[in-house]
Amino acid sequence: MTSTQRTLMVMAGGTGGHVFPGLAVAHRMQAQGWRVVWLGNPAGMEATLVPRHGIPMEYVRFGGLRGKGLATKFALPFNLLRACAQSLRALRRVKPDVVLGMGGYITFPAGLVTVLTGRPLVLHEQNSIAGLTNKVLAKLAKRVLVAFPGALPNAEWTGNPIRTELARTEPPQARYAARSGKLRLLVVGGSLGAAALNEVVPRALALLAPDERPQVVHQAGAKHIDTLKENYEAAGLSCGSDVALVPFIDDMASAYANADLVICRSGAMTVAEIAAVGVAALFVPFPHAVDDHQTTNAEFLAEQGAAVLVQQRDLSAELLADWLRGQSRDSLAAMAERSRSLAKPDATDEVARVCAAVAGANLEGKQ
């Protein structure tokens, strides 16, 4: 580390929705010569994922209270004090020029200590409904950034930082115009499998005449792939040239770009990625998400005619089959173009620029 090299500390953990956008910003800052250190939970996914990206880590142990018993709640003051002490030690070791909070439970104690020690804090909220931690810290932060307009008062709308390849896909007009034949459907269940989609989609496709059925790529997570295959077979559909069942998709940018329509949940990063690529989507929000934020995430696109929103309680094979019959490549292309128009493809650069500016530096060029 040179005497002029600046340091960014990223605070994020718990879920991919916090970690992956943090990684996008971290890589952007590293490309500009910044030193980046990550503050996370040793029990979180970040403890395994972040070091693989060549980013050193500091650790804070702190968890949430939702669904926990009385013992955990009574221990909160002790756990909070311990987390604050761990955060203070980490900040003293790293001496960051600016701290970026991307969410996760550890952001609360670490964010408080950041402010109390006089270091500049930048917050980024990924969801359309801010969590309690960010609602509190937003009143103390130097700059507050949001992925969805209106998520926090007096915040700057930057969008969600995404991987570079997603922001560089060919525009939807060109992609859709070059296609002919059957529609291409991508179903994304994520690592958890989205059991509702795994059950309804095969039955809906079975209700369509063979010439009405789209080509399907259905991703379901390794633990659910055998059950998914059974669901398709029970619906009378065999895997072959028109149905591909996969446990994982390595290249999501290509998967989105090759699809005419995506059926999926509406996590913050999924919505951001679909808009960035520009692809038609039918969102089925996870009904048990905190504060039902997946519904409001999906509404951001659906209210502009850039996606369709169906609640899981309303989703049926008959409803989905009827809706699919009414779609054409032209109608889906129009939806995709509206989605792309609402994207924030430069979100990674914007968040990185804010961090640099708060530290009194400039960021050059674009990723």
Curated annotation (Swiss-Prot):
It is a peripheral membrane protein. Disulfide bonds: none annotated. UDP-N-acetyl-alpha-D-glucosamine binds at residues 15-17, 127, 163, 191, 249, 294. It comes from the Bacteria. Pfam families: Glyco_tran_28_C, Glyco_transf_28. Pathway: Cell wall biogenesis; peptidoglycan biosynthesis. It is an enzyme of class 2 (transferase). GO terms for biological process: carbohydrate metabolic process; cell division; cell wall organization; lipid glycosylation; peptidoglycan biosynthetic process; regulation of cell shape. Keywords: Cell cycle, Cell division, Cell inner membrane, Cell membrane, Cell shape, Cell wall biogenesis/degradation, Glycosyltransferase, Membrane, Peptidoglycan synthesis, Transferase. It is found in: Cell inner membrane. One of its GO terms (molecular function) is undecaprenyldiphospho-muramoylpentapeptide beta-N-acetylglucosaminyltransferase activity. Its EC number is 2.4.1.227. The keyword Endoplasmic reticulum does not apply. The keyword Transferase applies. InterPro entries: GlcNAc_MurG, Glyco_trans_28_C, GlycoTrans_28_N. GO terms for cellular component: plasma membrane. It catalyses: di-trans,octa-cis-undecaprenyl diphospho-N-acetyl-alpha-D-muramoyl-L-alanyl-D-glutamyl-meso-2,6-diaminopimeloyl-D-alanyl-D-alanine + UDP-N-acetyl-alpha-D-glucosamine = di-trans,octa-cis-undecaprenyl diphospho-[N-acetyl-alpha-D-glucosaminyl-(1->4)]-N-acetyl-alpha-D-muramoyl-L-alanyl-D-glutamyl-meso-2,6-diaminopimeloyl-D-alanyl-D-alanine + UDP + H(+). Belongs to the glycosyltransferase 28 family. MurG subfamily. PANTHER family: GLYCOSYLTRANSFERASE, UDP-N-ACETYLGLUCOSAMINE--N-ACETYLMURAMYL-(PENTAPEPTIDE) PYROPHOSPHORYL-UNDECAPRENOL N-ACETYLGLUCOSAMINE TRANSFERASE 1. Cell wall formation. Catalyzes the transfer of a GlcNAc subunit on undecaprenyl-pyrophosphoryl-MurNAc-pentapeptide (lipid intermediate I) to form undecaprenyl-pyrophosphoryl-MurNAc-(pentapeptide)GlcNAc (lipid intermediate II). This is UDP-N-acetylglucosamine--N-acetylmuramyl-(pentapeptide) pyrophosphoryl-undecaprenol N-acetylglucosamine transferase. It comes from Burkholderia mallei (strain ATCC 23344).
